[in-house]
Amino acid sequence: MNASPWNETLTEADLARLRECERHVGYRFRDPNLLAQALTHSSIKTEENPSNERLEFLGDSVLGLVMTEFLYNYFQDRDEGDLTQIKSVVVSTAALAHESDRLGLSGFYNVGKGVTRRRNLPVSLQANVFEAVVAAIYRDGGLELARRFILRNLYHHVLEVVENQHQRNFKSLLQQHAQKELNVTPTYRVVSEKGPDHLKHFEVVAVLGKKVYKSGIGRSKKEAEQSAA
């Protein structure tokens, strides 16, 4: 793995703080600079000390690969629609933020003065730092160690979704989360309809405020809205 540009800027105090964070994460970094970058918000990045945005980008893909492969192998009797629905909940912003908070990552996250820091970090930032830590572990120790970290922290979300799937209303869950954390009510927009009348497939996106999220597909508008949620 390539060394990060942080090597000469970490102080003894920085290293002590990172080692404490490692205990929360349950992983010892060979290169603690990767963890330092994962914990740095763009509001305080410098040329020498980059933010975690690139790691977050990588972590999102690593997380998606690991969870997709796990669900594919674990639930061999489930179709693509079921697997997609399970995955959408397990790797949702709410789930990642929950795990980030449980691990105490917000206490180690470096943010600038302009970033709102209420009692806890905003949910989106908590989820982002979880993804960045996933990428840092992947860069430091490879895919298998990243896989262990992901499944150790998210496996119970898989069980929760499966055990309660027949009772879950994804639109209701999204609405509760959006109203509580973002003070907005989700809306849904049909972006495409395909197929003959007896085999229609609808593609719907969820909209929260001004942000449009990934689409969901279903055989009815309601099913597509549930998938999008």
Where are these regions (language model features)?
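Double-stranded RNA-binding/processing signature
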Residues: M1-A229
